[in-house]
Regions:
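Active-site beta-strand/loop signature of hydrolases that rely on acidic residues for catalysis
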Residues: 2-9, 23-45, 115, 138-164, ...
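Short, solvent-exposed loop/turn segments at secondary-structure junctions
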Residues: 10-12, 41-43, 76-77, 120-123, ...
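Short Gly/Pro-enriched turn/cap motifs at secondary-structure boundaries
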Residues: 58-62, 91-93, 152, 202-206, ...
Length: 251
């Protein structure tokens, strides 16, 4: 079994815990084999023992020293190489490459799947639409290369009602939370949210939002054995971040 996860570490504004504590929390509470971390930083001395990863040193820039990290334990990651559409790249060059990374997940030297770690960066707006085109273009090129084992994960800063049609219509990827039968209604939710992954403020009446997602190709969706996520599954997540993780286990 292999566990894939995504979690926002909350390093952009007012971090709640020191980095070493956050990495220990990842190991003890999420226990992933591979994880996409958004709004994330690597400790000053590098990744903790046993981890390897792909990220942009220094993050987005001097004022934003955080970004997206794809990290793994006991599994090798390799930056993915695939044929890109030159017309599409000319049409859209991602302005913040630190927020978007792509890696091959290697098991016993073979590529098990390719994972895209994405963050819906919001430099000039209140949601992730600014980044959505770049994320979709990255995945379109990857899927056009013939890869049938692709995972897209991260914090998109978009509600389900906005991001699901974009991903499903343009990429034909499967929303792993949609594989869960009989999800209970999330009271106080906005934007079609089904699980509470982002705490929008400290008010008891703050909107309950789902901003963190994992999508897969159909071939990988057939191998899913368990899905979990949100504050109900990670009840102490608010102690360390304003986001709760999402995880999926594959056979």
């Amino acid at each position: 079994m292999i566990r894939i996860a995504t979690w926002n570490m909350k390093q952009a504004v007012a971090p709640k815990k020191p980095l070493p504590e956050l990495w220990k929390w990842i190991e003890s509470e999420i226990d992933p084999d591979v994880i996409v971390l958004t709004e994330a930083r690597v400790p000053k001395d590098g990744l903790p023992d046993g981890w390897n990863g792909i990220w942009t040193p220094g993050g987005i820039g001097p004022r934003r020293t955080w970004g997206t990290i794809i990290a793994a334990r006991e599994i090798e990651l390799e930056e993915a190489k695939f044929k890109r559409n030159p017309k599409r790249i000319k049409e859209y060059i991602h302005p913040h490459p630190a927020t978007l990374h792509t890696a091959d997940i290697l098991i016993d030297g073979d590529t098990w799947a390719t994972i895209v770690g994405a963050y819906g960066f919001m430099p000039d707006s209140k949601n992730g639409w600014d980044a959505a085109l770049g994320i979709v273009n990255e995945c379109v090129d990857l899927l056009d290369s013939g890869n049938e084992r692709v995972i897209l994960a991260g914090d998109f800063n978009l509600w389900p009602k906005d991001i699901l049609p974009v991903v499903e219509n343009n990429l034909e990827l499967v929303d792993i939370m949609g594989l869960v039968d009989d999800l209970p209604e999330l009271k106080g939710a906005v934007g079609g949210s089904r699980i509470w992954t982002h705490k929008n403020g400290n008010s008891p009446n703050a909107a309950r939002q789902e901003l963190d997602f994992i999508f897969t190709t159909e071939e990988l969706a057939d191998e899913v054995v368990a899905v979990a996520g949100g504050i109900d599954d990670f009840p102490n997540a608010w102690d360390v971040s304003d986001h709760a993780p999402v995880i999926v286990d594959f056979k």
